[in-house]
């Protein structure tokens, strides 16, 4: 097709044509700086909805199911005049109980660890966020230390991603660097981050897939560019002493931007502590 266009243009005009095989990808991946303020507002809405969903406003331990929380989130977005780009999910982990034993929509009990995956669409933009929560047992004022440590280890994996991502590196090169540092620090994690913006899973380099931790052919070979957004999607699994060494998975996802100067930073902020249901 390019050759036909050049032939139709003739030598003089064809000589002005610059070939760039990545122009379509870069056009979709690159964000206009003025979008960031709008996107930050959307992230604020997401955090507000999640904070309310993971509270006693919505959850009554022993009665509320995970599916009840999902549909509260959908109703809240509908009330705000917004919509999701995928159906939200809420899941639970429980001491001494395998995840498959809990079923698809368990009743939330005290002592449960909760996880949500939630994304909204507004003004032509998409978000994708995952947070973790803990349901306090009677007499508790905070989550057990082992669960707090588990969250800190997942946050450290986020830090590693932000530190290792550089403009010009391919997604696969970033993945390799991130996993090497993860292993050096003794973390048991998985990296599966993706571009976001006009589309929930946007154009640009993938940094892993959950089942492709050795690199993603094609999509992982594209280089990171300045002025793009990422959903920093990942998980770290940590044995928790208070749960008799049972592994607990902390899966986090927040939006980050690659700035004009090549720094990767949070669009709004990340989750720093477990949401607490009292």
Describe each region flagged by the PLM.
Residues 1-278:
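Active-site neighborhoods and metal-handling regions in enzymes and metal-associated proteins
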């Amino acid at each position: 097709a390019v050759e036909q266009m050049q032939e139709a243009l003739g030598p003089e005009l064809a000589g002005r044509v610059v070939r760039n095989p990545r122009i379509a990808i870069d056009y979709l991946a690159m964000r206009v700086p003025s979008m960031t303020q709008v996107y930050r507002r959307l992230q604020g809405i997401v955090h507000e909805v999640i904070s309310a969903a993971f509270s006693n406003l919505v959850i009554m331990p022993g009665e509320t199911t995970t599916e009840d929380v999902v549909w509260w989130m959908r109703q809240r977005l509908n009330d705000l005049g917004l919509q999701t780009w995928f159906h939200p999910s809420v899941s639970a982990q429980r001491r001494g109980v395998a995840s498959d034993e809990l079923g698809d929509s368990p009743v939330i009990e005290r002592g449960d660890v909760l996880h949500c995956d939630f994304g909204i669409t507004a003004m032509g933009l998409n978000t994708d966020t995952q947070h973790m929560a803990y349901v306090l047992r009677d007499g508790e004022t905070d989550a057990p230390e082992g669960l707090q440590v588990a969250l800190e280890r997942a946050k450290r994996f986020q830090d590693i991603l932000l530190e290792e991502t550089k403009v010009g590196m391919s997604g696969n090169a970033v993945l390799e660097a991130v996993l090497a540092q993860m292993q050096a620090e003794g973390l048991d994690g998985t990296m599966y981050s993706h571009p976001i913006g006009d589309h929930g899973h946007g154009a640009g380099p993938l940094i892993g897939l959950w089942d492709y931790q050795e690199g993603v052919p094609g999509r992982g070979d594209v280089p990171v560019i300045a002025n793009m957004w990422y959903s920093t999607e990942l998980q770290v699994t940590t044995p928790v002493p208070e749960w008799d060494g049972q592994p607990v998975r902390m899966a986090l996802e927040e939006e980050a931007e690659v700035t004009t100067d090549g720094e990767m930073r949070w669009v709004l902020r990340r989750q720093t502590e477990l949401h607490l249901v009292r």
